Structure formats: structure tokens, C-alpha cells
């Protein structure tokens, strides 16, 4: 009798163990985008989600896909419209985010930012074209282009890496109309967020050519970056010759960290109010937007580097 009870107990435990394992959730395999170009000429996107939703009943819609550009006849665009009632901070205004992950590859977009200098020269607003993903183990993966719209001659490029409370930044600030590199720096929270100059191989090219008449608000420009495991290259296409002008060819590392993200990410573009980050040339430019300013996006593209994404 004892043998029978012992046998049945073992069978029960075995079945319970199998059942428990069956109920365990299998890890979800992340999905990655293949190469694509989104022209935003349809009501919905195959590649991007609209964060924050759309208000079709409102006269001040955040997102208007497939509408005509105000500055370039015959070009259909995605229009972002900021709401003056939006609170400050990234992600509080219109934003699109890729449905799946992206990784090492070539990214580019054709964008025109709003022209506000005659209307509100001290406005504090940011257009961000970037990648972003925070993971517990590897930390942040962010590569960005940013424009503080109070001065459309200036661009900000760089990365954020590191974990929560230990973030790390490399960045370059450039006046493309004048060909001036205002700064090329790195900093980290572990070091008190003090800016340190990047020199030598981390500061290439040391100078950039001026693009005559450059004004990110007056017309569309094509901006891009190429992301490799050991290198990042930010570039712009010359509006007349379509020559690729390299603005920063970053290789290697800072004394404290690499500065090059090494984990998967998402692909985004957003428009938001800042109350504490003025543009380099105007310390007063942190005002809340007074009007529903608009960003025009012609297209966004992604081409993965298959040899690195294995």
C-alpha cells in the first residue's frame, strides 16, 4: 500500500512540475524593422505609432498626415502641431515612435522646423529626431539630432548612454550657417555633470563648412546619422549639390565611457516645450509657446547594417 501511495505521489509531483513549466511565460523575442522609408502620405503608418493620439474633432490637431507642405509645393508631409497648453518636458507634445526595434544602421529624415523668430524669438521649444530605449541591464540607447527653434541656424547632435542616475552624454553644438562648432563635449552624472572638451580623434572633423543661407525653418533639409558598433557619423546633405557633409565622425571613447550605444532602440521624432534649455545664442529662449507652431516631416528612413545586427 505504501508503495502505491509513494508512486501516486511521485506521479502527482511530476504532473504538477510539467504543468507549472507549461504555464511559465516564454521570453518574447523582440521584433526588428527591416529597411523602410515612411513618406507619411497615408492616414496611418505601417512603421510608426502616434504617441498621444489624434484629435480629429479639434481644429488644432497634433498630427496631420498626407497634407500639403506650406513651403514646398507638391510635397505631402506629416505635420506636427504643438499645443500651447502642453506642459514642459520631452514626450509632452506630438511624438511618433517606431512600432518595432531598430539597431545599427543608417538613419535619415527630411524635416523643416517652424519659423518663430519674428513671432516669438524667446520661445523654448525642441524638435527632436532620435533613437531611444532604456534597458535595465544595458541602460540607455539614445542617438539624437535636436533643434531649439529659437535659432534655426544651430543644431545639436550627440548620444546618451548609461543607467538611471549614471547617465552619460557626448555632444556637439554647431552653427551650420556660419560653420562654427561651439562645443564638442562629454559629461556624466558620475562626474557631477561637468562638461569636458573632446579632442583629437573624438573631435573630428575639427571644423565644418558653412552652408550658405542655412536656416532649418526656411526649407527642408535631409539630416542623418550612421550607427556602427565602434563609430557614429552625423551628416547633412547639401541642399543644392546633395553632397554628404560630415558634421561629426565620432570614434573610440571618452576617458570615462564609450559614448556609443550598444543595445537595440526605437526610432522617434517629437516636438516639445522646454522651460530650462535655452538655445546657445539666446539665454532667454525658454518661454512657453504662444501659438500652435508646426513641424513638417517629408519622410523618415532606416537601413539596417545586416553585418552588425546578428
Region spans (language model):
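Bacterial N-terminal signal peptides
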Residues: 8-15
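Positively charged n-region of N-terminal signal peptides that target proteins for export
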Residues: 1-4
Amino acid at each position: 500500500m505504501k508503495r502505491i501511495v509513494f508512486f501516486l505521489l511521485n506521479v502527482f509531483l511530476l504532473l504538477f512540475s510539467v504543468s507549472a513549466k507549461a504555464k511559465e511565460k516564454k521570453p518574447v523575442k523582440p521584433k526588428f524593422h527591416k529597411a523602410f522609408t515612411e513618406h507619411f502620405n497615408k492616414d496611418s503608418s505601417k512603421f510608426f505609432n502616434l504617441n498621444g493620439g489624434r484629435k480629429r474633432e479639434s481644429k488644432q490637431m497634433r498630427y496631420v498626415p498626407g497634407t500639403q507642405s506650406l513651403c514646398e509645393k507638391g510635397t505631402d508631409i506629416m505635420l506636427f502641431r504643438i499645443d500651447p497648453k502642453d506642459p514642459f518636458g520631452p514626450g509632452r507634445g506630438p511624438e511618433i515612435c517606431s512600432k518595432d526595434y531598430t539597431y545599427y544602421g543608417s538613419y535619415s529624415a527630411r524635416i523643416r522646423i517652424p519659423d518663430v523668430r519674428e513671432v516669438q524669438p524667446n520661445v523654448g521649444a525642441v524638435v527632436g529626431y532620435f533613437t531611444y530605449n532604456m534597458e535595465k541591464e544595458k541602460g540607455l540607447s539614445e542617438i539624437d539630432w535636436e533643434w531649439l527653434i529659437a535659432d534655426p541656424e544651430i543644431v545639436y547632435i550627440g548620444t546618451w548612454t548609461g543607467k538611471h542616475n549614471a547617465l552619460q552624454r557626448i555632444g556637439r553644438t554647431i552653427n551650420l550657417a556660419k560653420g562654427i562648432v561651439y562645443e564638442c563635449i562629454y559629461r556624466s552624472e558620475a562626474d557631477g555633470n561637468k562638461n569636458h572638451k573632446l579632442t583629437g580623434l573624438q573631435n573630428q572633423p575639427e571644423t565644418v563648412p558653412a552652408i550658405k543661407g542655412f536656416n532649418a525653418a526656411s526649407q527642408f533639409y535631409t539630416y542623418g546619422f550612421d550607427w556602427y558598433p565602434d563609430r557614429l557619423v552625423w551628416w547633412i546633405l547639401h541642399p543644392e549639390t546633395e553632397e554628404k557633409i560630415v558634421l561629426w565622425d565620432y570614434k573610440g571613447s571618452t576617458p570615462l565611457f564609450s559614448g556609443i550605444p550598444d543595445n537595440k532602440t526605437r526610432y522617434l521624432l517629437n516636438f516639445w516645450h522646454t522651460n530650462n534649455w535655452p538655445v546657445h545664442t539666446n539665454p532667454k529662449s525658454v518661454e512657453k509657446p504662444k501659438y500652435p507652431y508646426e513641424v513638417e516631416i517629408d519622410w523618415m528612413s532606416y537601413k539596417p547594417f545586416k553585418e552588425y545586427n546578428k
